[in-house]
Amino acid sequence: MTEQPGRPKYYRGAVAISGDRIALVSDSPQRIERYERERGEGLQVADGAGRLVMPGLINLHNHVSMTLMRGYADDLPLMPWLTEKIWPFEAKLDGDDIYSGAELGIAEMLLGGTTAFVDMYWYADRVAEAAIRSGIRAVVSPAFVGTAFDGYVERTQRMIERYNGAAGDRIRVWVAPHAPYTCTPEQIRESLKLCERNGVGVNIHVAETLSEVETIRERYGKTPVEHLRDLGVFDYRALAVHCVHLTETDMEILSRQGVSVVYNPQSNMKLASGIAPVA
């Protein structure tokens, strides 16, 4: 089954794979038989009768290594969850822990039909290594908060040079300021120089909770979306994650600037953040 506009939808047929590429998609018995003859005895055939072949799913927002924290720190709103539980937990993790958590989370995604994901986390190079080993496609985004910005630009530049386009272009590297309430305007602007220099995108949490919206209004006299627009975040390919609490003006800004909004209903319910205004 294909769902792309202008492409045919095959309801009965075959998919042929050569190496790591799709070599044939057809519902023509003649084309399928010809392909089988050309490949000869080396062709392996899997009977997919009663099954569905479709494009892989894409998970647009992850902290994949947090799979290690499943079942931990339930029944808390976002800020107590972060400050009292998650950040202290993360402070005890090292790169090997992040790699192990990424391997587990990636394996679970692949089992569920997800073949590509976007990640934002610490030790992003280890997430990239786990993605390369697994065969999945990934956009890995080294994250920063304001208290841990020293050296970020230099480290991320090195990571872009090493991993952006790696593994046959399966891996991309983007920039990830954590959120407008945890990063200063100066830090966000500085991180955006990486986007300008390398042609990469930016991945950031936006308007996740009412308290965030109130904090940004108090600090800057704007909504989080207006604040990030004025900093130039949306001048690059941008993923705005959550966007639970938006004004009509916010929505117009995001639409006009071509920002991709990523809705996270399970996260927003778990942390009592609210319900995004999805039409």
Task: Name each model feature, range by range.
Residues 233-279:
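Active-site-adjacent C-terminal substructures of enzyme catalytic domains
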Residues 126-244:
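Metal-coordinating catalytic core of metallo-dependent amide/deamination hydrolases
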Residues 100-118:
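Small-aliphatic-rich amphipathic alpha-helix that forms the alpha element of a beta-alpha
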Residues 68-100, 107, 134-142, 210-237, ...:
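Active-site gating loops and adjacent loop-to-helix segments of metal-dependent hydrolytic enzymes
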Residues 15, 20, 50, 61, ...:
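Divalent metal-coordination and catalytic microenvironments
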Residues 112-114, 136, 199, 259:
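A structural motif
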Residues 2-54:
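Histidine-rich, glycine-flanked metal-binding segment
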